[in-house]
């Protein structure tokens, strides 16, 4: 598999010109699957279908969309320029055109407390699968872009607790509706203790790889 993440939208002409597509598609044809990011508002037939044709039938195209959260008010406050209906339409278009859908879900976005964070992570997982997602990536929301630090000083943001991320991952996997992964980058921001962080990383990576929740349950039982 090949993942091309460009910290933006692959089909944004300001990010990746269409003139570069033939070379990119040619290189990607040696892979079974190509995963690219796309903003839900940029799901456009005149851009995506030509690239899909360049790839050919031997390489499966998977589009990764950021839902972030299915919480209507929080989604609006995140200023992504989408709502649930826009996301649903984009997801339906992707599945209708025989592409796979990967969805990014934030675990504990701003404006939610810990119990709300777990509830809405699970509800967002349900919503993503209802939209036809094959894969869901759970992203623990972490500071680092300035805006979140500002929200943190006002008490409107804090990173999720490790057990919230583990519980959300366990919920998604046990549904059996598709693959669910937890992002393990920068875990020390969730768990600064080196020994506990190493154990957390091992449990998450095992669950990611095996798509089983036994290791997560053991970790949650130990607290």
Where in the sequence are the language-model features?
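Well-ordered, non-membrane alpha-helical segments in soluble/globular domains
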Residues: 15-24, 83-87, 117-125, 158-171, ...
């Amino acid at each position: 598999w090949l993942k091309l993440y460009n910290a933006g939208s692959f089909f944004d002409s300001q990010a990746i010109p269409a003139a570069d597509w033939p070379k990119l598609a040619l290189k990607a044809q040696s892979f079974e699957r190509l995963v690219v990011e796309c903003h839900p508002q940029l799901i456009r037939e005149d851009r995506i279908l030509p690239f899909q044709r360049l790839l050919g039938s031997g390489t499966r195209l998977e589009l990764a969309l950021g839902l972030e959260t299915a919480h209507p008010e929080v989604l609006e406050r995140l200023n992504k320029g989408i709502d649930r209906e826009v996301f649903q339409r984009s997801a339906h278009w992707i599945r209708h055109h025989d592409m796979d859908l990967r969805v990014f879900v934030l675990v504990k976005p701003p404006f939610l407390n810990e119990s709300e964070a777990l509830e809405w992570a699970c509800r967002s997982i349900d919503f993503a699968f209802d939209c036809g997602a094959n894969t869901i990536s759970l992203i623990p929301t972490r500071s680092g872009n300035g805006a979140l630090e500002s929200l943190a000083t006002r008490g409107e943001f804090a990173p999720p607790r490790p057990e919230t991320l583990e519980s959300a991952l366990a919920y998604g996997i046990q549904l059996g509706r598709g693959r669910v992964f937890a992002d393990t980058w920068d875990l020390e921001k969730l768990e600064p203790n080196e020994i506990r962080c190493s154990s957390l990383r091992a449990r998450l990576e095992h669950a990611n790889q095996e798509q089983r929740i036994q290791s997560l349950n053991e970790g949650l039982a130990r607290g």
